[in-house]
């Protein structure tokens, strides 16, 4: 039975209560307050829903992750990065990145990044929890991604690309930055061919929960200064 959250409690049900069909649906309801969002990620779940639906909270099994030491960069991508065609920065325009991620795409109907979702993550950015990666070409924003940094874990949320491999360049730059700062895992949530080509793979929900327990409260040395 699906658990419905109330606004006066930040408690989520145990992850093993998540449904098998649809895979990983853990709870519904609640709100997108900064406190609830932080608690959700610490617990091992994330919000994902369409406009007109209640807020839905997910903890899929298996979970797609990338370990920084297992990042795979193809020869063609490495060559592109050496060419210096794109300029990559962190936290210089979080609102523009999340707006671009929310924009309609040719292969999808609608967007799950609602206005309420955008406002919630912009607040997390103001609090120093959510971060963005900007990829520019000749000063124009052509790619990027955003997510949350907590302890030694980074929770990726969404990425976009308006130029060839721009989001891959941003992602590889981010992973290298996180590895050097002591991060041990990037949560990619759901599988895609794009992420698998970069070295992402699936782990069980139980193994993901083990990473949370061991690394959420450990320090990192990441600098996000623009």
From Swiss-Prot:
Function text: Functions in the N-end rule pathway of protein degradation where it conjugates Leu, Phe and, less efficiently, Met from aminoacyl-tRNAs to the N-termini of proteins containing an N-terminal arginine or lysine.
Q: Which GO terms describe its cellular component?
A: cytoplasm
The residues forming a coiled coil are none
Main location, first listed in the record: cytoplasm
Q: Which SUPFAM superfamilies match?
A: Acyl-CoA N-acyltransferases (Nat)
Q: Which reaction does this chain catalyze?
A: N-terminal L-lysyl-[protein] + L-leucyl-tRNA(Leu) = N-terminal L-leucyl-L-lysyl-[protein] + tRNA(Leu) + H(+); N-terminal L-arginyl-[protein] + L-leucyl-tRNA(Leu) = N-terminal L-leucyl-L-arginyl-[protein] + tRNA(Leu) + H(+); L-phenylalanyl-tRNA(Phe) + an N-terminal L-alpha-aminoacyl-[protein] = an N-terminal L-phenylalanyl-L-alpha-aminoacyl-[protein] + tRNA(Phe)
Q: What class of enzyme is it?
A: transferase
Q: Quote the subcellular location field of this record.
A: Cytoplasm
Q: Which Gene3D superfamilies match?
A: Leucyl/phenylalanyl-tRNA-protein transferase, C-terminal domain (3.40.630.70), Leucyl/phenylalanyl-tRNA-protein transferase, N-terminal domain (3.30.70.3550)
Family named by the database record: Belongs to the L/F-transferase family.
Q: Name one GO molecular function term.
A: leucyl-tRNA--protein transferase activity
Q: What is its EC number?
A: 2.3.2.6
Keywords from the UniProt entry: Acyltransferase, Cytoplasm, Transferase
What is this protein's name? Answer: Leucyl/phenylalanyl-tRNA--protein transferase
Q: What PANTHER family would the database entry show? A: LEUCYL/PHENYLALANYL-TRNA--PROTEIN TRANSFERASE, LEUCYL_PHENYLALANYL-TRNA--PROTEIN TRANSFERASE
Return any one Pfam family short name. Leu_Phe_trans
Q: Provide the GO biological process annotations.
A: protein catabolic process
């Amino acid at each position: 039975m699906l658990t419905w959250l109330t606004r006066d409690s930040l408690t989520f049900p145990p992850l093993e209560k998540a449904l098998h069909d649809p895979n990983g649906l853990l709870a519904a309801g609640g709100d997108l307050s900064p406190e609830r969002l932080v608690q959700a990620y610490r617990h091992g779940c994330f919000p994902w829903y369409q406009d007109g639906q209640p807020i839905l909270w997910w903890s899929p099994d298996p979970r797609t992750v990338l370990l920084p030491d297992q990042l795979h960069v193809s020869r063609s991508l490495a060559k592109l990065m050496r060419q210096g065609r794109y300029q990559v920065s962190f936290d210089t325009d979080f609102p523009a990145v999340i707006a671009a991620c929310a924009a309609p795409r040719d292969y999808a109907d609608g967007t799950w990044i609602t206005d309420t979702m955008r406002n919630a993550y912009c607040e997390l950015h103001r609090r120093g929890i959510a971060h963005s990666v900007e990829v520019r070409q000749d000063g124009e924003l052509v790619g990027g991604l955003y997510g949350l940094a907590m302890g030694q874990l980074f929770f990726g949320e969404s990425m976009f690309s308006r130029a060839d491999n721009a989001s891959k360049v941003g992602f590889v730059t981010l992973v290298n930055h996180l590895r050097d700062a002591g991060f041990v895992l990037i949560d990619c949530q759901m599988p895609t061919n794009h992420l698998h080509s970069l070295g992402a793979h699936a782990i069980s929900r139980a193994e993901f929960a083990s990473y949370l327990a061991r690394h959420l409260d450990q320090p990192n040395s990441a600098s996000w200064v623009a």
